Amino acid sequence: MKQYIVDAFTDKPFAGNPAAVCVTEAPLSDGFMQKLARENNFSETAYLLREGEGWRLRWFTPGTEVDLCGHATLASSFVLLNYYEKENDAVQFYTRSGTLTVARKGGQYEMDFPVCPQREVPVTDDMEAAFGIRPVKALLGDDLVCVFADEEEIRRMAPNQTLLMKLDGRGQSVTAPGTDCDCVSRSFFPKLAVPEDPVCGSAHCQIAPYWAEATGKSEIHAYQASRRGGHLYCRLQGNGRIAISGEAALVAVSEIVAKESPPPVKRVARDAGYKPALLGQRLKALAFALLKPLCFSLVAAPQRGVRTT
């Protein structure tokens, strides 16, 4: 099985968000995919399997399978359109979040994702304790999004991972207005065994719509201000969908040699009356019953080379 390491939302290796992309020839068990994702220890490992005219796509963090992942989808598109479907400029994925289409446009890959509904919720002391700074606004959808006044607060932030676990949402994202872009953000997913996602595409299904409404723009340039950093170009399409674009860079190609473990041998449960000695007696009786006809036939047959009178 081929595995590709791709950095998403960047045009150069060792930046953006790394993802492992496995191109499979047959279905793998959930257990095997989870073990390999844990071994890779990236925020996401993607698994691709040809299905009809498209590809079945599943995403695993080191801790669990997830319903949607932006950067691993972008990475998967990069792999397929550069190494498996070079003649095409678009690829279709069948996922737990429905059918997703990604189109290659120049050097970028544009993903068509659903906008994630969200509502404003009260800012709490627990949020302030977790982030070390009090947000000016909070929104809750699949993730908790906390808005801050200054992008430097986002860059310097060192959240308490234990306290983040107690907040609502699958993960927690923080965002603020940007100086050289429309917004900066960071995303944390300790509940999924991902302390910080370097560049999170799916989080911008909430972040970008918020800033589009706040600024009156339909196109949002977002920068994820993690240590690795990455750029996302988001466009609200007005139909409950959002286009999220970015670049990608190949880092490595490898062969996965580990195989699925064989299914465990089912052992017959011993009943209360099981006794090894009794079992041995039964086996002896069975052997005697099978060999008895053969013994009698040998005794009854005349022996060659012996005269009889």
Residue ranges and their predicted role:
Residues 261-263, 267, 272, 276-277, ...:
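Short, low-complexity intrinsically disordered segments enriched in A/P/G/S/L with frequent Arg
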Residues 1-68, 74-262:
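Active-site proximal loop and beta-alpha junction motif in alpha/beta enzyme cores
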